[in-house]
């Protein structure tokens, strides 16, 4: 099983996908990596172990989704998260739980959640 730090990084990947569905270009990203981590920390236990989803996890997922208002925000978050998960091993079960977070939290994203996401393609 992956460590809590590794799972947090995997959960952060979900944030990228949550952020990609909100529109409008802007010159500078306003969402920090710290905000991403803070919003997704409540999701670690669920991604690590499954079971019941903590309501504060969904609050964080929805909050992060609402923070990503611009293309620059979404690309910046994507790059931050890709760096965080780079080289971190995880199981298919963990990846599946992380990928399912947006839907379980009522956030509809039209993108595949994957470490191979091309951040430059995010609009």
Curated annotation (Swiss-Prot):
Record keywords: Disulfide bond, Lipid-binding, Signal, Transport
Molecular function terms from GO: lipid binding
Disulfide bonds: 33-80, 43-57, 58-105, 78-119
SUPFAM superfamilies from the UniProt entry: Bifunctional inhibitor/lipid-transfer protein/seed storage 2S albumin
Signal peptide range: 1-25
GO BP, sorted A to Z: lipid transport
Coiled coil location: none
Top-level taxon in the UniProt lineage: Eukaryota
Keyword Lipid metabolism belongs to the record: no
UniProt xrefs under Pfam families: Tryp_alpha_amyl
Chain's role: Plant non-specific lipid-transfer proteins transfer phospholipids as well as galactolipids across membranes. May play a role in wax or cutin deposition in the cell walls of expanding epidermal cells and certain secretory tissues.
UniProt cross-references to PANTHER family, sorted A to Z: NON-SPECIFIC LIPID-TRANSFER PROTEIN 2-RELATED (PTHR33076)
Family in the record: Belongs to the plant LTP family.
Name under which the protein is recorded: Non-specific lipid-transfer protein 3
């Amino acid at each position: 099983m992956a460590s809590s730090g590794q799972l947090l990084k995997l959960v952060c990947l979900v944030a990228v996908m949550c952020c990609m569905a909100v529109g409008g270009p802007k010159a500078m990203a306003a969402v920090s990596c710290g905000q991403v981590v803070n919003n997704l920390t409540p999701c670690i236990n669920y991604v690590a172990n499954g079971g019941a989803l903590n309501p504060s996890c969904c609050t964080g997922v929805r909050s992060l989704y609402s923070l990503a208002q611009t293309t620059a925000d979404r690309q910046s978050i994507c790059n931050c998260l890709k760096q965080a998960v780079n080289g971190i091993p995880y199981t298919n079960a963990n990846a599946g739980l992380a990928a399912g977070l947006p839907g379980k939290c009522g956030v509809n994203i039209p993108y595949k959640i994957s470490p191979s996401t091309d951040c430059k393609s995010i609009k």
